[in-house]
Amino acid sequence: MEGLNMSLECTPASRSNGTCYGLAVCGYCYDFVETRQVVKEYEQFNLVVIGLMLPLIGCLGLIGNALSAFTYSRREMISSLNVYLFALACSDIVIILTAFFLFFLENMRKRSEWATYYFAVLSPVMFPLGLTAQTMSVFITVASAFDCLVLVAASEKFKSKFCSVNTSILVGNFNDFKNVIVCLKIIVKIFLLGIFYNSPHMYEIYVIDCWSTMYNTASKDVCPTALRSNVDYVRIYYVYMYTIVMAVGPVLLLIVINTAIVISMRRSSSPNSESDIITLVLVVCLFISCNVLPLTVNFLELLFGIINSYLIDLSNLMVVVNSSCNFLIYYTFGSNFRRTLRYYVRAALNRRAPAQNAANNRTPPRVKLCLPPTEVLI
């Protein structure tokens, strides 16, 4: 490791100055746990919420989102709305995986040397990737809500330009395929927008070699760049832009769209797609509910300068909850989703059954040896 020189001193005086054996002290550049005391009650709370609940919910969410992505990608489920829900499931998978890294692995840094090392090595990639996935999830939710609003409230002429009502490639027409292509183009644009919006995060941290006084060994750590330490940048990008682009703006827009959808459904219901519309409305409601706490944390910091670690941990947990629970809504309220998933699960089980029977039938069953002679002759 570059810079490591065991002949140099590592005394309390040198550590207080941020150096040890010629290396920087891990955590010195941003005041990690090695240089500050953590309240025991909060440490226990953090372990339960981030160390236990988050990975448990996240693992279940990965399974649910994988099933959701599989189901919505089937030929008989193709429609403009389902294309958005497929993309949402994929982005939620990335959110959960990066949440394991950004929240759970970060929590384990206080308890594991390998967690400290790999957190630092992977941070420059995982940090912007996770935030890009969150941005995609937000805007895909908004786009799907708008698609749903067009489906229930717009005229047939306007509707044919933006959404496809049919949920089967076998009965769909050319306009359905054209509208699905439009949705795919919108998703690609959302992806590019997410990369552009989160590109500053790639220049916020850098990796250094350091000496861990906690584990008494050389390790790696992440430190903030001059950009991340700039007060004006933090205030404009993290406070104002995040509030408008990622928090208040989408939530208010979704409340308006959801309200319009519900009103339109009351006036004229569409039996063929009603379950899909209800599913989307509930997905939006879940999104709004899970974003109340992050909004509260953001406003407390913006208006009053209050930074509450307990609320921050809970808001991080709500991010994972939001990404993990959509499958429950899809399966409970989406009749097409439930029917399609059951069909493929049964088909998979039926394929395994003949294979198992073939393996068991490699030798003739003994029951044939017990048949009466007359039946054998026949």
UniProtKB/Swiss-Prot annotation:
Molecular functions (GO terms): G protein-coupled receptor activity
Gene3D superfamilies (alphabetical): Rhodopsin 7-helix transmembrane proteins
Membrane topology recorded in Swiss-Prot or TrEMBL: Multi-pass membrane protein
Protein name per Swiss-Prot or TrEMBL: Probable G-protein coupled receptor frpr-1
Keyword hit for Transmembrane helix: yes
Principal subcellular localisation of the protein: membrane
Membership in a protein family: Belongs to the G-protein coupled receptor 1 family.
Cysteine-cysteine disulfides: none
A GO cellular component annotation in the UniProt record: plasma membrane
Domain of life: Eukaryota
Source species taxonomy: Eukaryota, Metazoa, Ecdysozoa, Nematoda, Chromadorea
Annotated InterPro entries: GPCR1-like, GPCR_Rhodpsn, GPCR_Rhodpsn_7TM
